Amino acid sequence: MSDAAVDTSSEITTKDLKEKKEVVEEAENGRDVPANGNANEENGEQEADNEVDEEEEEGGEEEEEEEEGDGEEEDGDEDEEAESATGKRAAEDDEDDDVDTKKQKTDEDD
């Protein structure tokens, strides 16, 4: 019974993180997030992803191996974005705030 409750919570958390990730990506790219939250589909990015998938299917096995290597690099970018969505970037920002605070104290002492 407790497993079901945890399951529901994790689904909500995952959804929230996805939405937050989209907001972060849109802010970094300078685009507004659509009201329905389907940023990729409205901006045509979803269609571009589908075209890449079709090219991979049509390509030979040799091309797939090369693309898999490229995919690993892209996965690294996604991991960085996911980390920022989970608060790692927020923690780094907090560290910056601490530095600013120290500078202010130094300025006041002078």
UniProtKB/Swiss-Prot annotation:
Q: Which GO terms describe its molecular function?
A: histone binding
Q: Where, per the database record, does this protein carry Phosphothreonine?
A: T8, T13, T14, T101, T106
- Subcellular localization, as worded in the UniProt entry: Nucleus
List keywords of the entry alphabetically: Acetylation, Isopeptide bond, Nucleus, Phosphoprotein, Ubl conjugation
Q: How is it modified after translation?
A: Covalently linked to a small RNA of about 20 nucleotides.
Question: For the modification N-acetylserine, which residues carry it?
Answer: S2
The GO annotation for biological process reads:
negative regulation of apoptotic process; positive regulation of transcription by RNA polymerase II
Q: Which residues carry this modification: N-acetylmethionine?
A: M1
Checking InterPro entries in the record gives: Pro/parathymosin
Question: Sites of the modification N6-succinyllysine?
Answer: K15
- Name a single GO cellular component: nucleus
- Indicate yes or no for the key word rRNA-binding: no
List the residue ranges of the region (Disordered). 1-110
Residue positions, PTM N6-acetyllysine: K15, K102
Compositional bias per record (Basic and acidic residues), positions renumbered to this chain: 13-31, 100-110
Compositional bias (Acidic residues) at which positions? 42-83
The protein's superkingdom reads: Eukaryota
List residues of cross-link (Glycyl lysine isopeptide (Lys-Gly) (interchain with G-Cter in SUMO2)).
Answer: K102
Residues with Phosphoserine modification? S2, S9, S10
Family of the protein in this entry: Belongs to the pro/parathymosin family.
The free-text function statement in the UniProt record for this protein reads: Prothymosin alpha may mediate immune function by conferring resistance to certain opportunistic infections.
Record's subunit section: Interacts with NUPR1; regulates apoptotic process.
Name of the featured protein: Prothymosin alpha
Task: Tell me what gene encodes this.
Answer: PTMA
